[in-house]
């Protein structure tokens, strides 16, 4: 009989092992066997919990996305009701420590690439994209007309993605302060006319 809570402990071990494997070997070098080896468990257990490699990547990204959504919620609540502060909070969440470690950044890049080919991952990416745009649009709409708010949200989402991508590809730790400053300046520019 399995121990109570063991399923979640195993899943967490395997997700951590997946992040480390993608960090060290990339997605092509990450297999159910390599993840099992890093987690010090059998390949059969990995297969039991996740089915296949795409299932493992999906579960890993759901974990990363939960961290992102938690950081976003935490920061938006702390920002209270001020739209500028809440927009900055959304930006900051995307550059939160949970999103800018080497294993997580490499996993994001692998996920984006794989989501163009795997429908389950594509749906997950679509949910993430819509959530970001919706959150940004809701805050901009408190200060801008609806059409301008949608346009501003699209622009800021593209800036967040671009700054994050450049940082991820830079080959070293991401300069979150510089990224945040650029995004904050953009927010200030958009809201200056409001």
UniProtKB/Swiss-Prot annotation:
Keywords: DNA-binding, Repressor, Transcription, Transcription regulation. The keyword DNA-binding applies. Gene3D superfamilies: Tetracycline Repressor, domain 2. It comes from the Bacteria. Pathway: Amine and polyamine biosynthesis; betaine biosynthesis via choline pathway [regulation]. Residues 8-68 form the HTH tetR-type domain. Signal peptide: none annotated. GO terms for molecular function: DNA-binding transcription factor activity; transcription cis-regulatory region binding. Residues 31-50 bind DNA. GO terms for biological process: glycine betaine biosynthetic process from choline; negative regulation of DNA-templated transcription. NCBIfam families: betaine_BetI (TIGR03384), PRK00767.1 (NF001978). Repressor involved in the biosynthesis of the osmoprotectant glycine betaine. It represses transcription of the choline transporter BetT and the genes of BetAB involved in the synthesis of glycine betaine. This is HTH-type transcriptional regulator BetI. The gene is betI.
């Amino acid at each position: 009989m399995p121990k109570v809570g063991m399923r979640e402990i195993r899943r967490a071990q395997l997700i951590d092992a997946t992040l480390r494997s993608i960090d060290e070997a990339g997605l092509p070098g990450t297999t159910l066997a390599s993840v099992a080896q890093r987690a010090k468990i059998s390949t059969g257990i990995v297969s039991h919990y996740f089915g296949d490699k795409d299932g493992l990547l999906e579960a890993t990204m759901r974990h990363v996305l939960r961290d992102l959504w938690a950081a976003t919620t935490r920061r938006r609540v702390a920002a209270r009701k001020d739209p500028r502060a809440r927009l900055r909070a959304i930006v900051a969440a995307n550059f939160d420590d949970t999103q800018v470690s080497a294993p997580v950044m490499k996993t994001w890049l692998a996920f984006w690439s794989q989501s163009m080919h795997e429908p389950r991952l594509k749906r997950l990416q679509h949910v993430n994209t819509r959530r970001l745009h919706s959150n940004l649009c809701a805050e901009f709409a408190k200060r801008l007309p609806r059409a301008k708010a949608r346009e501003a949200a699209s622009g800021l989402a593209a800036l967040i993605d671009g700054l994050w991508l450049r940082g991820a590809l830079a080959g070293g730790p991401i300069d979150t302060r510089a990224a945040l400053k650029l995004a904050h300046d953009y927010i200030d520019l958009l809201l200056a006319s409001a």
